[in-house]
Amino acid sequence: MARDAGVSAFPSPALGGSQIGGRIRYRLARSGTLSASLRFYAPADRLKAGDVAAGLDWRPVGTIPAGLLVERRQAFGPDGRSAFSLTAYGGISTAVGRAAIDLYGQAGIVGARNRDMFADGIAAVRFQLDDALPVKVGAGAWAAAQPGAARVDIGPTIALRPADAPVTIALDWRQRIAGNAAPDSGPVLSLAVGF
């Protein structure tokens, strides 16, 4: 995900900005209820602030993308944080007529001794205007909170999802309507690849 973090003479808490990440899940049960998880995350401009995490992902109903994730995070460098974490998550991606609806949310806690809570979510509705084009246009809302930083954004969104490729490219304008976390309002370009 690419986003201009901006520069300010009076720095505010940051929540967002350009970042990279990936995740692999390996099913340990045929039902899909228990999986091994391995992922990494880092701010694009501060790789040493990122981490790699390994853990177990439990979904009570294997066909429903909602569950609990227990991880051990290991920092890449001194700017990151090594700790255990517990995350509850859930979401849906469905189509209603010409509308594509995406809802996702997660909340959790990081640290066994020095505990910090976090939460974030997204709600987006996009419409396919032309059956011949794999482009959908709509609007979305994004929210996130962690110690010392919180924000809510709304804005238009456009997504390209080729039918024969597991790739989604989205371009949003995120207008910050609540919170004081950097970066300021602006465009966000996201690239997601799934297998």
Protein language model features and the residues they cover:
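Residues that define the transmembrane beta-barrel architecture of outer-membrane proteins
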Residues: G16-I20, K48-V52, G80-L86, A99, ...
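Outer-membrane beta-barrel "beta-signal"
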Residues: I158, P183-F195
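Outer-membrane beta-barrel strand-turn architecture
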Residues: L28-R30, A44, W58-I64, T94-R98, ...
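Transmembrane beta-strand segments that form the barrel wall of outer-membrane beta-barrel proteins
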Residues: M1-R3, A9, T33-A44, V52-A54, ...
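Detector for outer-membrane/organellar transmembrane beta-barrel domains
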Residues: R73-G140
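Outer-membrane beta-barrel proteins and related beta-barrel translocases across Gram-negative bacteria
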Residues: M1, G21, R25, A53, ...
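Membrane-embedded beta-strands that build the outer-membrane beta-barrel scaffold
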Residues: I24, A36-L38, L56, V70, ...
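Outer-membrane beta-barrel initiation region
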Residues: M1-T33
